[in-house]
Amino acid sequence: MNPIQSFHCKLRSLATVLDGETARLLRALDGEDSDFEDSSARILCDLYSEVQTLKDDVNAHLDKARLESRESTHFIKAAKVLMKKNSADIIKLREFFQKYGYQARDKEDSACEHRVSNSSPGLAVCKDTQEPGVKQELSEPRVPRGSAPEEPLRSPQLSDFGLQRYMVSQGPANPRQETVSLKEDRASETTPAKDPSVQVLKTPRCALKMDDFECVTPKLEHFGISEYTMCLNEDYTMGLKNMKSIKSSPLSGVGGEAVETGPVTSDNSFAIPGPMIQQLEKNDVEYINSPLPPKFCTPGLKIPSSMDSTDLVSIDYPLSKPNSSPTDLEDKDCAPLILNSDECYQSFADPHSPTITSYENFTTPSPPKVTAIPEDILQMLKYNSNLASPIDVKAMPLRRGFTSKGQSTRGAANKENW
């Protein structure tokens, strides 16, 4: 092979390699090569994020649907329970209405009403309600021909609840007022009081049976009182009554003698002290005199008073009972009702006048001698035209309240009250 030709081939292949490398380097410089390599990874990441977002949305929708389904199931269960309760209540109401003569409408009437509600009001006409004059008759419950006339509606009776024995006979009720409708007329004609088929039970008359219980008064033994313990339960009231009866009898002291202070006894009473009975009797309104005003006496101090020194004279008011004897008012063994304060201090002598010590002497001391003139007086003398120069201090006259040697100290003792 020609060496020149082989050299040109090698040079041509080198030039192509250089061109490819140059282009790759240019793309690397421009960033096109990196974008091309990362584009697939970026696209994969975007797809993954979108899938994750869609998955989260689907999960949220599923949770919401699950909650709604749970709520719907709870609602359905509650509706079923309510339907059962309503059906039971409807059955009870139907039985209650049927018990008092209520009859439900026939199926034909309900089907007719259903057709009328579904169809237009102008074209919907029921077969049974073609004539307007028969509407009132059709509104009433249909009665079979073979059956007897049923009992009309009536108010509940005690017999309906099994309380026949508490039924009280009643007079015939006042007839209702006539109305236009035939239904009200028929109902008023067949009232329970006028209907001969209705039997009004009379009040049962039965004798009071005393077999079950006995109405017996309580025995005295239950309260601790009996014929054997009667004398032991007597109180002071009975003793006082017995004491009054003994006083009123001639056995009591006569001629101003005092009642015995020993214990008074009777056959059926306890021994009661005599002074206690006398004191209780003196407290009675019939034997009480008006009390004297008390006198107050303080030992060691005499208070001059404008009133007379004579004692107050007691005034004896007349007793309410003229037949009362002086023995009823004697009270030797009892303490008097009024205590005189003078009697408590009779043993005490009049106290001596208190001695006045040196610190209690209220004589006025001699006034001090002024040797220097104060500054405020000097200022006053400076502006006084009558005095050219200050003069010697003269003896000042005594002020009010200063006493001489021969003057009594009575007025000086009260100088604090000036």
UniProtKB/Swiss-Prot annotation:
Its main location: cytoplasm. Residues 196-417 are annotated as: Binds microtubules and contacts the microtubule-binding domain of SKA1. GO terms for cellular component: centrosome; cytoplasm; kinetochore; meiotic spindle; mitotic spindle; outer kinetochore; SKA complex; spindle microtubule. The modification Phosphoserine is found at S34, S119, S120, S139, S155, S159, S290, S325, S353. Keywords: Cell cycle, Cell division, Centromere, Chromosome, Cytoplasm, Cytoskeleton, Kinetochore, Microtubule, Mitosis, Phosphoprotein. Residues 350-417 are annotated as: Required for localization to kinetochores. InterPro entries: SKA3. It is found in: Cytoplasm, Cytoskeleton, Spindle; Chromosome, Centromere, Kinetochore; Cytoplasm, Cytoskeleton, Microtubule organizing center, Centrosome. The modification Phosphothreonine is found at T190, T217, T298, T364. GO terms for biological process: attachment of mitotic spindle microtubules to kinetochore; cell division; chromosome segregation; establishment of meiotic spindle orientation; metaphase chromosome alignment; mitotic cell cycle; mitotic metaphase chromosome alignment; mitotic sister chromatid segregation. Residues 102-417 are annotated as: Binds the NDC80 complex. Residues 111-157, 170-198 are annotated as: Disordered. One of its GO terms (molecular function) is microtubule binding. It comes from the Eukaryota. Belongs to the SKA3 family. Component of the SKA complex, composed of SKA1, SKA2 and SKA3. The SKA complex is a homodimer organized around a central W-shaped coiled-coil structure, formed by the interacting domains of SKA1, SKA2, and SKA3, each end of the 'W' is extended further by the C-terminal microtubule-binding domains of SKA1 and SKA3; the complex forms extended structures on microtubules. Interacts with the NDC80-NUF2 heterodimer of the NDC80 complex (via coiled coils); the interaction localizes the SKA complex to the kinetochore and is required to establish kinetochore-microtubule end-on attachments. Component of the SKA complex, a microtubule plus end-binding complex of the outer kinetochore that stabilizes spindle microtubule-kinetochore attachments, promotes alignment of chromosomes at the mitotic spindle equator (chromosome congression) and assists suppression of the spindle assembly checkpoint. Kinetochores, consisting of a centromere-associated inner segment and a microtubule-contacting outer segment, play a crucial role in chromosome segregation by mediating the physical connection between centromeric DNA and spindle microtubules. This is SKA complex subunit 3. It comes from Rattus norvegicus (Rat).
